[in-house]
Amino acid sequence: MNIPTLDDLNFSNSKVLVRIDINSPVDSKTGKLLDDSRIKAHVETIRELVSRGNGVVLVSHQGRPGDNDFTDLEEHSRLLQKHLDMEVEFVGDVMGPYARERIRNMKLGSVLLLDNVRFVSEELIEASPLQHSRSFLVRRLQPLFQGYVNDAFATAHRSQASLVGFPLVLRSSAGRVMEKEVSALAKVFNEGEEPKVFIMGGGKVLDSLRIIENLVKRRLADRILTGGLIAELFAVAKGLDLGKDNLQVLEKAGVLSLVPRARKLLLSGAPVEIPVDFKVEKGGQVYEEPANKVTAVIKDVGSTTVGIYSSFIRDAKIIVMRGPMGVIEDERFRESSRTLLKNSLESPGYLIVGGGHMISLLGGIGPLDSSKVHVSTGGGALLLFLAGERLPALEALDISAREVLKK
Ligand SMILES: Nc1ncnc2c1ncn2[C@@H]1O[C@H](COP(=O)(O)OP(=O)(O)O)[C@@H](O)[C@H]1O
Ligand SMILES: O=C(OP(=O)(O)O)[C@H](O)COP(=O)(O)O
């Protein structure tokens, strides 16, 4: 693939639309952002574009409709302003008359943040770059810009309008985050030794299952240590009775229908490990139970599991960690993810850690040795990239290089 970078396009004194990913963990009680790592990550790209006299218009999503973390981007704009140390105008609109008026009238050298792009229904459709290039989002915004930059590595696995539509109609390049992630990950992973251990948790069960299927098919993982909801799915697939409450959680997440796929993976001999115990909560009380005797709602993996997983980590040459083991928004269920992260950092292997929730746990850990760890902004995108899948956002930039830049 031929992905143009900012060095290739050299945007200057232009209006540039920049797709970033500042989707961040949200405290479900207060609605406040719990971490600003992804916001900080984009500062370099934005500063560089501003320093070349460009008017920078930022577009991002936050959460998914119906979820607790589906919010507007006002708080994000304040944090971005703090990290950039310059004014960021928050526009509470994405593509309507107000947004277009603010973009038309903005000064070169200034920064403007549009609202959550998933407020626009077209953004929620997975479609081809060509289809998205004809969306209202692209048709309304494209005439206001001379260029498009995609810096949203963490969403590069989605084929959504703001990611794949613009490269077909604007001169486009990758931003610095996108560029660095792609080159660092390809190098580390391809040149890395075995065993490769993947630690996978979190709430996005369908994504995780797809990734595990890919890893298994390509024989890229020596061990896959599961936590979070994906561990519960595999536990059910293995025939463990997790009780009515936990089945309800899986049903509510719409993932029970994935049990046969998980079962097929287990039967095919996939190296998937499931927890031997869990931390559960009942009536405000927290305690540990063996995986075959669960009587309450699972909130984290148990301490025996952490011990076993840690022994696999110690022997690994490459450790990839994505998605927390438990409901880390609650301090009582943060410990196992934090311990596994610490043990991974202390082990002799190289660590690649990614995803909004996992990187939020790095905060209290102190300075990291960049020769031993790569912190990725991506979670699902990171793993799909490592598993060798083609990421639609990168493909769209590749098409752009061939079809738009050559014209
Ligand atoms: N056992 C569990 N039950 C319910 N939710 C869980 C469980 N374990 C983890 N989670 C949730 O998973 C979410 C993080 O998952 P995800 O978004 O996939 O990770 P990341 O942002 O790191 O890629 C958190 O909100 C956390 O509360
Ligand atoms: O947080 C993200 O992905 P991740 O949870 O895999 O790290 C990205 O912002 C993508 O969000 P999405 O999975 O709702 O498309």
Curated annotation (Swiss-Prot):
GO biological processes: gluconeogenesis; glycolytic process
Signal peptide location: none
Chain positions recorded as substrate binding sites: D21, I22, N23, R38, H61, Q62, G63, R64, R118, R158
Major location (coarse): cytoplasm
Positions annotated to bind ATP: E329, G355, G356, H357, M358
Pathway annotation from the record: Carbohydrate degradation; glycolysis; pyruvate from D-glyceraldehyde 3-phosphate: step 2/5
The protein's Enzyme Commission number: 2.7.2.3
CC annotations in GO: cytosol
Annotated Pfam families: PGK (PF00162)
Keywords: ATP-binding, Cytoplasm, Glycolysis, Kinase, Nucleotide-binding, Transferase
Catalysis: reaction(s): (2R)-3-phosphoglycerate + ATP = (2R)-3-phospho-glyceroyl phosphate + ADP
Location in the cell: Cytoplasm
Gene Ontology terms for molecular function: ADP binding; ATP binding; phosphoglycerate kinase activity
PANTHER family: PHOSPHOGLYCERATE KINASE, PHOSPHOGLYCERATE KINASE 1, CHLOROPLASTIC-RELATED
Subunit record text: Monomer.
Family statement drawn from the similarity comment of this UniProt entry: Belongs to the phosphoglycerate kinase family.
Protein name, as recorded: Phosphoglycerate kinase
Source organism of the structure: Metallosphaera sedula (strain ATCC 51363 / DSM 5348 / JCM 9185 / NBRC 15509 / TH2)
Organism lineage: Archaea, Thermoproteota, Thermoprotei, Sulfolobales, Sulfolobaceae
